[in-house]
Amino acid sequence: MLRARGPGPGALLLRAALGLGRRGRSWQRPQGQDTGVQVHNSLTGRKEPLIVARSDAVSWYSCGPTVYDHAHLGHACSYVRFDIIRRILTRVFGCNVVMAMSITDVDDKIIKRANEMNVTPASLASLFEEEFKQDMAALKVLPPTVYLRVTENIPQIIAFIEGIIAHGHAYSTATGSVYFDLHARGDKYGKLVNTVPSATAEPGDSDKRHSSDFALWKAAKPQEVFWASPWGDGRPGWHIECSTMASEVFGSHLDIHTGGIDLAFPHHENEIAQSEVFHQCQQWGNYFLHSGHLHVKGTEEKMSKSLKNYITIKDFLKTFSPDVFRLFCLRTNYRSAIEYSDSTLVEAKHLLLGLASFVEDARAYVKGQLTCGPVEEDVLWERLTSTKKAVKAALANDFDTPRAVNTILDLVHHANRQLRAVSKEASGPRSPTVFGAIISYVEQFFETVGISLANRQCVSGDSSTVTLRCVVDELVRFRLKVRQYALDTPGAAGEARKRQLQERQPLLEACDTLRQDLVTHGINVKDRGSAASTWELLDPRTRHQKPGDRG
């Protein structure tokens, strides 16, 4: 469930009880290089110019997974959306992104699951960390510059906690735990959601000073993994991990921090509090970007393990391709909730197939394999120019991918209308250059956001793939010659031509059978009239959804 952005009555009463006034947004516009992009900054609740310290080293911290179970589509949605943004920043706006991502490999959920499975927490975390990375690779999510595991940063976390204590914002207890003193933070707490944690009933043995204080270090419990610390054996709290690891890489200032909307409070809010106290700075992170939840269609429930309404990434990819999922994500703004259903995925799949079909047909036209009537070349050049301008403007406006994709689809629609196949040789000039330019731009756009429309024959350059391509080329050429012979009856007319075609009908049937057989092996042959035939490799998840042949 999405959290409200304003404080409720209970929160206001708690702030009054703590001596905290109503917080105003006090965001400081950074100094540095303007990327040319406007982003919705959760720190201000509005769009701001994205200004980074250095465009050749944009610092970006991403909250990564807690590796205790299989990753599901709710996770995938957030990571794919931010991967798209990262690609746009890099490839459209020329930023070099340095991304650090956390791996929480010790926490309550990991310990509980390890006990249930009768394995060590370390082995469980290692198993699901590797699976997470495989899932991200399968979804074509670019890996971060560096992964940061909690268990490899325990000394740094302890030192970070000591710094917060030294600045008077944390305290240790007799039981060996350490808590952040929210009262000491005063009116500076609540930069993201303008609230503080609601008062909650504490166990009778709680040694917190205030119920809203949160753990920096948790005293060890029997049979739990622990590390030695100045306060006794224990392990880190959740929020302190990210503050420490982000600071280890980026120091006291961070350009971009990302995560799902459910992390805004309390996780990111607590990160801000810890980091600004430790570094003694007014603004640790300049921009916080949050992605909307993936919802199950017909409900307001987010997809989550706790609600048992999730689909694992591996199961999803048995039915749909990563490109289909990526297009599904592109069609909504990254901040919006997105509704999951088979129908929306099928719609994305058909859009992708239509785009690939257009590219294939346009390429056939450029190569002279598709005969068309006259083309309104000037109109297409003008539309291509306006499309490029509109797409860049959309991406600069808080990464408005729905608008960008719709603009591309409009270009494809108008270009497709010009590819009117004719059965006879068309008279007049051809316009291959403009279609070549459109192909190049459309493929480049989708490649930028991580989707490949290029002929799948060319995705691998190893020798066996090249050999296979040559073999299929020869097979398709041989089939074309047989088909042309079966259809060509020079000098014959009337009954003689009819008899000749009937005699050669088995050859045409054999050509059709071969084409159908090749589809079962993932190869789609298109006959473009009697003059040419082309082929492409099919995604096994979509090979039965291929649009019909043209020509």
Swiss-Prot record:
SUPFAM superfamilies: Anticodon-binding domain of a subclass of class I aminoacyl-tRNA synthetases, Nucleotidylyl transferase. Zn(2+) binds at residues 63, 242, 267, 271. GO terms for molecular function: ATP binding; cysteine-tRNA ligase activity; metal ion binding. Pfam families: tRNA-synt_1e (PF01406). Binds 1 zinc ion per subunit. Disruption phenotype: Mutant mice are embryonic lethal. GO terms for biological process: cysteinyl-tRNA aminoacylation. ATP binds at residue 305. A motif ('KIIK' region) lies at residues 109-112. One of its GO terms (cellular component) is mitochondrion. Its EC number is 6.1.1.16. Keywords: Aminoacyl-tRNA synthetase, ATP-binding, Ligase, Metal-binding, Mitochondrion, Nucleotide-binding, Protein biosynthesis, Transit peptide, Zinc. It catalyses: tRNA(Cys) + L-cysteine + ATP = L-cysteinyl-tRNA(Cys) + AMP + diphosphate; 2 L-cysteine = S-sulfanyl-L-cysteine + L-alanine; S-sulfanyl-L-cysteine + L-cysteine = S-disulfanyl-L-cysteine + L-alanine; S-sulfanyl-L-cysteine + tRNA(Cys) + ATP = (S)-sulfanyl-L-cysteinyl-tRNA(Cys) + AMP + diphosphate. Its cofactor is Zn(2+). L-cysteine binds at residues 64, 104, 267. It is found in: Mitochondrion. The keyword Protein transport does not apply. A motif ('KMSKS' region) lies at residues 302-306. NCBIfam families: cysS. Belongs to the class-I aminoacyl-tRNA synthetase family. Mitochondrial cysteine-specific aminoacyl-tRNA synthetase that catalyzes the ATP-dependent ligation of cysteine to tRNA(Cys). In addition to its role as an aminoacyl-tRNA synthetase, has also cysteine persulfide synthase activity. Produces reactive persulfide species such as cysteine persulfide (CysSSH) from substrate cysteine and mediate direct incorporation of CysSSH into proteins during translations, resulting in protein persulfides and polysulfides. CysSSHs behave as potent antioxidants and cellular protectants. 'KIIK' region and 'KMSKS' region are required for cysteine persulfide synthase activity. This is Probable cysteine--tRNA ligase, mitochondrial. It comes from Mus musculus (Mouse).
